[in-house]
């Protein structure tokens, strides 16, 4: 007999950074145990118990090693009803409690950008032309985009401009044609057979006023707002649903697009919770973790109507930075709040900034204003000792 998915559950969320998932689960009324590589202040507040993983995600296998050790300890204490494997370990095999993820083989396969490109082509979906390094000659002209075959966030994505540069590229990488357009995504909830697109989102990529460089992911604005593009956005949401259904995914999933002049082109499929979660929940009022949980019982939500615009911007350090105070003293509209005493090197994410507004411009202006207040406070912190700064 299945347990009711709407009763409070004891949920373990573990991964490289899990604040967004854990906070959503907590807002849904569940009892959350969380472990990641940061243990940010708001993660500690959202969870009944939190743990800082002893892992360096840059070392292959280290995050999985630490996560397995923690899961084993938690399972032995019989503390959880289910677990969510978050960023960095979504395709890991775990035992001892129900795993609320796509099957590891499915996650691994779909996260392979080269495999996905071939599948999209075979299935007839318009997508960004993608090839292996060896087949890059099939693509049209320069510049081209080179990115890791697996992975997210855009940190290692780069452009190449000549055949000589291309000849010097090696490793487990893919090459894509550069396509002009708006970076976008569709958030989908699925039960393995059917899917519901719950929002279309604008992606902030390489946003300079957030300190983002290159093609780095810097956040989202929900809903995607493009005048005279309503029909195209509706088409994009339908495509997102169809892809998710054909791949037989379950739970919360995301499909990345480039909204080009020719129409929406599929870029990637993310078979996991996405960074757009905060913006989607602010805009729609729905709880994505609860929708994710219910989908494993075959219950799907109706598509919510946006109440307004929700935004999340990831602020990156413009220089080496010491965090000497709780940044919530500057504005409560922050998430992924670092601990006082922690350090951020140039280019590291510092904090997420949130906003909402009836108009997109309002939400963006609020992000910019809060970003300015945080930066001014951080500049004061850099020139003062911890005792000199009053919170």
Give a label for each model feature:
Residues 12, 291-391:
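Peripheral (often C-terminal) accessory segments that flank ATP-dependent C-N-forming ligase machineries
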Residues 100-165:
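A conserved helix-loop-beta module that forms one wall/lid of the active-site cleft
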Residues 120, 130, 140-157, 171-187, ...:
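ATP-grasp fold ATP-binding core
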Residues 1-115, 122, 317, 345, ...:
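ATP-binding N-terminal substructure of ATP-dependent carboxylate-amine bond-forming enzymes
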Residues 190-195, 259-263, 317-319, 357-358:
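Short acidic-glycine loop/turn motifs at beta-strand connectors
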Residues 180, 184-248, 270-296, 304-305:
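ATP-dependent carboxylate/phosphate-activation module, predominantly the ATP-grasp catalytic core
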Residues 249-261, 304, 386-391:
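A short glycine-rich, hydrophobically flanked beta-strand micro-motif that places a catalytic Asp/Glu
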Residues 32-33, 127-128, 144, 173, ...:
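Hydrophobic anchor at the start of a short beta-strand
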């Amino acid at each position: 007999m299945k347990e009711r998915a709407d009763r409070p559950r004891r949920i373990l969320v573990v991964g490289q950074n899990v604040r967004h998932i854990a906070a959503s689960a907590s807002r849904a009324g569940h009892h959350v145990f969380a472990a990641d590589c940061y243990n940010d202040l708001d993660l500690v507040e959202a969870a009944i118990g939190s743990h800082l993983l002893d892992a360096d995600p840059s070392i292959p296998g280290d995050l999985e090693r630490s996560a397995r050790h923690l899961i084993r300890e938690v399972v032995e204490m019989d503390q959880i009803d289910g677990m969510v494997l978050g960023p960095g370990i979504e395709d890991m095999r775990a035992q001892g409690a129900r795993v609320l993820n796509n099957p590891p083989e499915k996650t691994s396969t779909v996260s392979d950008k080269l495999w996905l490109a071939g599948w999209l082509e075979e299935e007839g979906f318009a997508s960004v032309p993608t090839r292996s390094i060896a087949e890059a000659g099939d693509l049209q002209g320069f510049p081209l985009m080179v990115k890791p075959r697996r992975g997210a966030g855009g940190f290692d994505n780069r452009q190449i401009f000549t055949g000589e540069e291309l000849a010097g590229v090696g490793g487990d990488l893919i090459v894509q044609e550069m396509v002009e357009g708006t970076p976008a995504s569709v958030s989908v909830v699925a039960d393995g057979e059917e899917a519901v697109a719950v929002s279309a989102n604008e992606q902030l990529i390489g946003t300079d006023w957030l300190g983002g460089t290159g093609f780095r992911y810097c956040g989202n604005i929900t809903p995607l707002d493009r005048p005279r593009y309503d029909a195209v956005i509706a088409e994009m949401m339908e495509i997102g649903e169809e892809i998710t259904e054909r791949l037989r995914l379950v739970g919360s999933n995301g499909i990345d697009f480039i909204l080009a002049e020719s129409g929406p082109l599929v870029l990637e499929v993310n078979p996991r919770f996405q960074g757009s979660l905060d913006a989607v929940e602010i805009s729609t009022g729905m709880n994505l973790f609860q929708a994710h949980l219910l989908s494993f019982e075959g219950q799907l939500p109706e598509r919510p109507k946006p109440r307004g615009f929700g935004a999340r911007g990831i602020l990156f350090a413009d220089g080496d930075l010491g965090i000497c105070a709780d940044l919530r003293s500057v504005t409560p509209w922050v998430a992924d709040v670092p601990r006082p005493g922690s350090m951020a090197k140039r280019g590291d994410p510092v904090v997420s900034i949130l906003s909402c507004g009836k108009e997109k411009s309002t939400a963006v202006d609020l992000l910019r204003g809060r970003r300015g207040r945080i930066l001014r406070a951080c500049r004061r912190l850099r020139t003062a000792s911890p005792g000199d700064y009053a919170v």
